[in-house]
Amino acid sequence: MGHQQLYWSHPRKFGQGSRSCRVCSNRHGLIRKYGLNMCRQCFRQYAKDIGFVKLD
């Protein structure tokens, strides 16, 4: 079995490996609430543009 046959051969239909950030394709720190599907770093960058307001 060569590398081409083994690379990404495992099915990724659920779990962390199946989801990624819609902005930067990162798989860590993903915020899925409200269908955001953004990592926390990108969320902080785009939160104001999306319409989120930081409360005191």
Swiss-Prot record:
Pfam families xrefs: Ribosomal_S14
Keyword terms of this UniProt record: Cytoplasm, Endoplasmic reticulum, Metal-binding, Ribonucleoprotein, Ribosomal protein, Zinc
Role description: Component of the small ribosomal subunit. The ribosome is a large ribonucleoprotein complex responsible for the synthesis of proteins in the cell.
Subunit text: Component of the 40S small ribosomal subunit.
Name of the molecule in the record: Small ribosomal subunit protein uS14
Family: Belongs to the universal ribosomal protein uS14 family.
GO BP annotations, alphabetical order: cytoplasmic translation
Cofactor note: Binds 1 zinc ion per subunit.
Binding site for Zn(2+): 21, 24, 39, 42
Required co-factors: Zn(2+)
Organism encoding this protein: Hippocampus comes (Tiger tail seahorse)
UniProt key word Cytoplasm: yes
Family matches, as PROSITE patterns: RIBOSOMAL_S14
Record GO cellular component, one term: cytosolic small ribosomal subunit
Record PANTHER family: 40S RIBOSOMAL PROTEIN S29
Location of this chain's protein in the cell: Cytoplasm, Cytosol; Cytoplasm; Rough endoplasmic reticulum
Molecular functions (GO terms): structural constituent of ribosome; zinc ion binding
Domain of life: Eukaryota
